[in-house]
Amino acid sequence: MSVLRPRHLMSIAAALALTAGGTASAASAQDSSAALREVMFVGNNWDGTADVINSTGDFGKIGRINVIPDKAERIAAINADPIKWIYFMAIRNSVGEGHDQFVDDMYSTPDGKSMVVSRPSFADVVSIDLATGKINWRFPVAGYRADHMAVSPDGTRVAVSASTANKVQVLDINTGKELGEFATGDKPHENIFTKDGKYIWNMAIGDVNTSLDDPAWDWTKGDRHITIVDANTYKQVKIIDMRDRLDAIGLKDFSDAVRPAVFTPDESKLYFQVSFFNGFLEYDVAADKITRVKTLPKNPATSEDRTTWVNDSRHHGISMNPSGTKLCVAGTMDDYATVVDRATLQEGPLVTASKPYWATVSGDGKDCIISESGADQVTAIDFATGQKVVSVPVGDHPQRVRLAHIPADWTGPSAS
């Protein structure tokens, strides 16, 4: 997303450091910045690891982090609390598809020394020291499940969805201290900071784990809306319920659960996916209306039984190249990904992929990176040609992929 560019954050941080002190401190800051390298974190949800890969080129693997070094301690605490145990098992047997969800989202700290991770089944956010693999701090979220996160443009704050508590909590990324929180709709999911850092957008997706998936039962899915808040006061600025906007253009049978979304570089348009739909929609922010709908091809081999689609997601994952001319869409249940021209909405080649669950952008902006959760690999697709570039094996059930910065000589924690 254009609003979440860690490679830009490091440049800003370095520039501020260089102007804050004398020659010695400036040189120190410059050396510190130069000692970091841009990478990608890949969260392997079902095995509790995060792979670190190159952010461009061959996307080769650099190292791996165990994001659940405290697993025994956490499991013991869950087993000692009947309510926590019930939720833990419910996550495993519903949204986890029979697996525990150990890592959802990840970001690096501004100094590149730590990885901050949200862990759904453990209902927390932890900071892990990249040098030692040990936990720096742990923040238990409200309720019983942690979900998507977002990092502020200056890299100092991280917002995490506490999905069973219907709220977002904002933390100091260095200390884990809670700075504020705000209420959302049912089951908050995606979070996006605007690029000026003034606002946070949260998308609540409702109860995606039930089998009442026919449009006639849509009302059972809960209160699904976008919440926009002031990123400094955490006060509500606006609520956007896509139900009204969908109905206005005749899409009464569409779900209003906004899934992955991405802004244009100027943030005038939002492109978003909704539950059960093979495609995406364009929303004009100023006009407050849906302006275009793009339906993407169905895979003939995909069952039309909605209850077989993972967590109500037919398509889940969307990103945009830095110039805002191309979109990349993960056609999750249809087993492909494709690059779409934003002006014409014409899709390119359908690149075969196994349950792609996320889409992001390479460090140089040339490629779309998708996580193939069904094949345990990430795949790069050239924005210019729409063709596959390379696939790289990772861990069990990769989902979120994020740009990050780590020490240049890092190859893994010393404890591994």
Explain the meaning of each model-derived region.
Residues 26-416:
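Predominantly soluble domains enriched in secretory-pathway, periplasmic, or organellar proteins
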Residues 13-17:
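Sec-dependent N-terminal signal peptides
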